[in-house]
UniProtKB/Swiss-Prot annotation:
Residue ranges of coiled coil: none
Binding annotation for substrate: T153, H154, G155, V156, N157, R158
Name used for this protein in its record: RNA/RNP complex-1-interacting phosphatase
Residues covered by the Tyrosine-protein phosphatase domain: 61-208
GO MF term list: phosphatase activity; phosphoprotein phosphatase activity; polynucleotide 5'-phosphatase activity; RNA binding
Membrane-spanning segments: none
Domain of life of the source: Eukaryota
Disulfide bonds: none
Family note: Belongs to the protein-tyrosine phosphatase family. Non-receptor class dual specificity subfamily.
Gene3D superfamilies reported in the protein's UniProt record: Protein tyrosine phosphatase superfamily (3.90.190.10)
Species name: Bos taurus (Bovine)
Alphabetically ordered keywords of this record: Hydrolase, Nucleus, Protein phosphatase, RNA-binding
Chief site of localization: nucleus
Amino acid sequence: MSQWHHVGGHWGQDRVFSGYSSAKKKGGNHIPERWKDYLPVGQRMPGTRFIAFKVPLKKSFEKHLAPEECFSPLDLFNKIQEQNEELGLIIDLTYTRRYYKPEELPENFPYLKIYTVGHQVPDDDTIFKFKNAVNGFLRENKDNDRLIGVHCTHGVNRTGYLICRYLIDVEGMRPDDAIELFSRCRGHCLERQNYIDDLRNGPIRKNWDSSVSRTRGFEDSTHMMEPVFTATKPVNRRPKHNIHQTQGYPEPRHFHTWTQDLQQSERKFSQNWNIYQRCHVPPPGPPGEDYFQRRYSWNVKPSAGQGGPNKRFSPGSYYRVPYSAYYRWTK
């Protein structure tokens, strides 16, 4: 059986990625159910680095869509650039690989896949992976203002839950404030009552790996994530690995070096940490409306400095990741 191994020695043969191997393969290019009902991209959540969006679809899906319905990885970057924002990381929570490939993102762009089962509250391991990824990104990008883009299929339920879970557990935000902020900025409200109930009434999740001591939590937790980059060499020159040989796990990509940084840090999670500055959040939508109504949405107004229609993203103009990346594949 083929597995990943971290070059620095923190990946072993007993380390197995969780989640995807039990997923059923879904072939074809059928549009995800209700995908058209949702806005492609929300707005940045004020006081945070988060922006949520629905899953972009690769070009082969476009034959099933009207031109105005298309939303590709390239469209994603254009829409975020139109908000005068810059994306620095994508966290993909979908439980499949069929919607788009990391190779369709700009060269060397940081991309992290966390297979997250839909409809049910994410387990503690998934929550911990997400927190680790966000913390690592913030630590390495404290001198810039790049955003963390998070998506599931619709960019609402799994996405909203994990973003809110982070804001509640790490930033000390009140659950209703976190839910309200996400809903207003996404343009759609959290729909699943089990997610809402857990955010409001569920326990605060630990910010370290429950299977190890706190002082070694970050060091031993890197196996729980799957950081990958788009390939830096042409796609047709990459070695091919059969999905059955890899038991459904993603093909090897480049490791993000923030895993090394994670191994040496133990962060104090504080309610008054300055990533989120508490402020009044106006109700999301028209007065008197119940914003927990299923799939209720309202118009998202563009940012004041929104760029013009001629301001378009081109892969060659995007920034390069200022650190090395590497991987090793063993059998």
